[in-house]
Amino acid sequence: MLDNPLIQQVLFEVMEEDVVGFDVLNVLIDSNEVTDDEISRQLEVKLNNIRRILYKLYEARLVDYNREKDEETNWYTYTWKPSLEKLPALVVKKMKNILDELKKQLSTEENGMFFYCMGCELKFTFEDAMDMGFRCPQCGGVLHEYDNKKDMATIKEQIAYIEDEFNQNPLFFKY
């Protein structure tokens, strides 16, 4: 399941782009139940970093924990376990949001006219370019009409990829 690119992208966002999170998830999946301290030792990563990742995963409801108090030391031990059954629904929700944004962006690209500063590599809508007198606000250079066919093709490819994943991957069928 974790080798799916859409799932990886969503997990990457959940873990705020911390790649160690994938290692943490793999340890959880392999062990089924493990303490944060054991994960820290196994991965040779600071305990605080492991806990931060676990809390992010917990907020997304992708892990659960049990808390036990050691009667001798009065310290709590947290045992973590994966709870990935909610992952497909989370992926679908996030990907639908991305899909909506891509479709809005495509509509803007299809219905708009754009201008481009070759020096600064900045793109502007016709309205913005007109307001600026067809001059770049950063370098003062002349703005040129921009052919956005490649941009539209890229957006269409991204939309098709996500829609294909939803339609062909059994992981997402019930959502």
UniProtKB/Swiss-Prot annotation:
The keyword Nucleotidyltransferase does not apply. Keywords: DNA-binding, Transcription, Transcription regulation. The winged helix domain is involved in binding to DNA in the preinitiation complex. Monomer. Interaction with RNA polymerase subunits RpoF and RpoE is necessary for Tfe stimulatory transcription activity. Able to interact with Tbp and RNA polymerase in the absence of DNA promoter. Interacts both with the preinitiation and elongation complexes. NCBIfam families: PRK06266.1, transcription factor E. Belongs to the TFE family. This is Transcription factor E. It comes from Methanococcus vannielii (strain ATCC 35089 / DSM 1224 / JCM 13029 / OCM 148 / SB).
